[in-house]
């Protein structure tokens, strides 16, 4: 993780942490860097954005930087992160840029960089961008006259992505009542258009973005809103997306939440039944619920655990050829169809399993028993020092020994904040609370808490 770019791009409060000057310079660098690969010096870069008020401001700044360095900028306008990835990897683009802070509040924003393969940008390129932002690379020449880049409205790319999504459905959705929570974000028109075209009866909420209501008490981080809709309208299933629609959580016909762990279990079993689960493995992160692994053990599915972050999940999948992986939060990667988490593809695949198995989502998820989990964050002066402290480690080991085979404890640093996260899974919420507080009390007693 660098000074500016974290595990999911350059993210922070608009014009405080991430400024228009930063965006302009990122554009300047990318236009120059990729232009060197072309005889005419002209790179071709595609840009998407979410519905935040500041996304337009950052789009203009990036375009100014790109075209000033001689690159052509292709604008998908409001779209999803996975659509930028799809367009970048299926057309002749040098890279893609998504302007979004994902599930964060409207006043934050971010710049996500995607390479020509549709993957998150490699660390060596990010390192060079950081050097340029810090003034270590000197001046980049400005393009002049006919060498100044062009700006192209490229809604055709977004439409092609929508067609691709529809091509993935192997069953008609006719007669199925589906709830969609668009989080007032990138999926606000796209998700409904896809499900309507496939024949579903859609009930859409939080699809009226105004620049400040993205993720505001809605979407995958406020799943209770969709739960209420599913119960009130007696729907068959519901899907909730986050601000840039790279994640999806589900609600079954009873109004109960289906997490990313449930999705991994349901699709992993579906693939195993069809002898298509490569390596007989599903990729998870260390934050997946203890119950998921017990459920996998019961059906003979093996698993890999990575660090938290869909970037690490994808790297493991890519290196080993695995087909399914993801996070509890709903970042699910179907590597046959995408190189990133894609909330709409996740929803389509859950529909496919329901229709193929002729079962409800609650029936498909039933064998997975989720263990009670308590996760608490503590702000600290130095997250690495706090986590590595000998007394803190001893407290963690004591909890692990007390839990034995009936639970687990995980202590880790946040990738984006000065925070240590303490998580316990056990037989009861009370037991989880007790053990989490034990560790946090030690962190506080050692003077690390802010």
Task: Name each region found by the language model.
Residues 1-64, 68-69, 151-178, 384-385:
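An N-terminal, well-structured beta->alpha segment
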Residues 48-50, 180-182, 252, 336, ...:
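Short glycine-centered, acidic/aromatic-flanked micro-motifs in structured strand/loop junctions
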């Amino acid at each position: 993780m660098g000074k500016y770019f974290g595990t999911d791009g350059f993210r922070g409060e608009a014009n405080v942490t991430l400024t228009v000057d930063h965006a302009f310079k990122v554009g300047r660098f990318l236009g120059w860097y990729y232009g060197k690969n072309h005889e005419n010096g002209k790179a071709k870069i595609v840009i998407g954005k979410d519905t935040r008020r500041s996304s337009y401001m950052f789009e203009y700044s990036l375009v100014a930087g790109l075209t000033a360095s001689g690159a052509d900028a292709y604008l998908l306008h409001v779209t999803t992160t996975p659509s930028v990835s799809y367009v970048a990897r299926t057309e002749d683009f040098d890279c893609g840029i998504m302007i979004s802070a994902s599930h964060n509040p409207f006043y934050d924003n971010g710049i996500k960089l995607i390479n020509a393969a549709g993957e998150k940008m490699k660390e060596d390129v990010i390192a060079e961008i950081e050097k340029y932002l810090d003034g270590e690379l000197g001046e980049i020449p400005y393009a002049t006259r006919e060498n100044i880049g062009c700006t192209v409205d490229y809604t055709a790319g977004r439409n092609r992505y929508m067609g691709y999504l529809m091509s993935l459905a192997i069953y008609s959705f006719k007669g199925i009542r589906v709830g969609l929570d668009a989080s007032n974000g990138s999926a606000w028109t796209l998700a409904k258009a896809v499900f309507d075209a496939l024949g579903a009866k859609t009930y859409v909420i939080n699809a009226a973005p105004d620049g400040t209501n993205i993720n505001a008490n809605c979407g995958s981080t406020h799943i209770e809103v969709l739960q209420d809709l599913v119960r009130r309208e007696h729907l068959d299933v519901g899907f909730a997306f986050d601000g840039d629609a790279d994640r999806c959580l589900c609600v079954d016909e009873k109004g109960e939440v289906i997490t990313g762990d449930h999705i991994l279990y349901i699709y992993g079993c579906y693939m195993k039944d069809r002898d298509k689960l490569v390596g007989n493995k599903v990729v998870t992160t260390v934050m997946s619920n203890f119950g998921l692994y017990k459920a996998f053990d019961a059906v003979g599915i093996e698993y890999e655990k990575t660090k938290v972050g869909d970037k690490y999940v994808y790297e493991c999948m890519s290196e080993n050829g695995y087909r399914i992986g993801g996070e509890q939060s709903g970042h699910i990667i179907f590597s046959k169809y995408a190189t990133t988490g894609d909330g709409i593809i996740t929803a389509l695949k859950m529909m496919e399993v329901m229709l193929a198995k002729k079962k409800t989502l609650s029936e498909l998820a039933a064998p997975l028993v989720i263990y009670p989990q308590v996760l608490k964050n503590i702000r600290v002066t130095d997250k690495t020092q706090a986590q590595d402290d000998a007394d803190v480690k001893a407290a963690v080991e004591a909890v692990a020994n007390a839990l034995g085979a009936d639970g687990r404890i995980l202590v880790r640093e946040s990738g984006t904040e000065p925070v240590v996260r303490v998580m316990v899974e056990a037989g009861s919420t009370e037991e989880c609370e007790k053990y989490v507080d034990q560790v946090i009390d030690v962190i506080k007693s050692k003077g690390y808490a802010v």
